[in-house]
UniProtKB/Swiss-Prot annotation:
Keywords: Host cytoplasm, Virion. It is found in: Host cytoplasm; Virion. The gene is vif. InterPro entries: Lenti_VIF_2 (IPR009979). Pfam families: Lenti_VIF_2. GO terms for cellular component: host cell cytoplasm; virion component. This is Virion infectivity factor.
Amino acid sequence: MLSSYRNQKKYKQNKIREVGPQLPLWAWKEIAFSINQEPYWYSTIRLQGLMWNKRGHKLIFVKEENGYEYWETTNKQWRMELRRDLRLIAQINFRNAWQYKSQEKWNIIGIWYDSPGEYRDKEKQFWFHWRIAMCSCKKERWDIRDFMVGKHRWDLCKSCIQGEIVRHTEPRSLQRLALLHIVRNHVFQIMPLWRARRVTVQRFPWSGTEGLYDTLVYTGLLGHGINI
């Protein structure tokens, strides 16, 4: 028993610990500022980003043209187009480098970063459609027009369902409790928080593979011939 204990202790001493993503100091300061505005902000972003990374659709590189990198989602039924300005990236200005396409116009993503706590209102369109495009749930017989007038959408994953319930019901209300109870057995992979903290963060905000901040966002809508 004593020998086994010593081996375990030696293993722990020799184990290389990863401190976390190696970000510049200004990035840590601004992330901390956002966390202080909404305590759940960072952990929610990391968890949902990981879930989509494992089972959802991906954002893939398409081409480079005229100083921009063009990207699109692998979800062909609900396709979104994004691009990033390489000149801004060269200036280490990642916040305003990304743009999304809506009604044939390119809109800057990153307004939320200037005013933490209000980004959901400022870029609501982008956030909403990013979630739909990245989620791998089947969206059969589902129309955005039905959703906008208040019809339920039970064909989405548990995470999406719970998010909409929480968004459109009052805190601690009986309505919210009843709806969450209905969907509690919906199949979905839950990602524990300790795994979320171990994922490296790079230059791309919304994926575990290409991002500076794991910043969960929805994008402008292309697909099903729908314009915003």
